[in-house]
Amino acid sequence: MQSAPALQEHASRFDEPVRALLRTKGRNPVWSVTPDETVYHAIEMMSERQVGCLVVLIGGQLAGIVSERDYARKVILKGRSSQETRVREIMTTPALFVTPEKTVADAMRIMTNRRVRHLPVLEGDNVVGMLSIGDLVNWVITSQQQTIKHLHNYIAGNYPA
């Protein structure tokens, strides 16, 4: 029977790099707009792509992020027109981000402490992915399911000697 430390590898999935979460999530495009586009265009794109945010790029570089929350708070509640308002007027800048080497726990901490639902992943100057709060919740659920499975196997004595 394996010892309890052998189970610890399954409990430390939060220490895995964001790169592992992106790999598990699969290759999803990161949708973007420029600061000069209308908020209407950005919201239309989010709706068509079924995403809650877009990265804002200037010359291929991350300039900010625009989300449904930005739209609700900075356009709708202020009585502004989405067809006349530019993305640059409501985007969140500078955008918070993580690198692929940061841990899943780091990403969770940033999202929780800063109360954001989306976090771009930057490798150098390139946006290589987007984490959502849903991605992190799925990671937690999968991690807990794996831990439960391994604990059941451990209790049942199904680990090799």
Per-range role (PLM):
Residues 1-161:
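Tandem CBS (Cystathionine beta-synthase) repeat/Bateman regulatory domains
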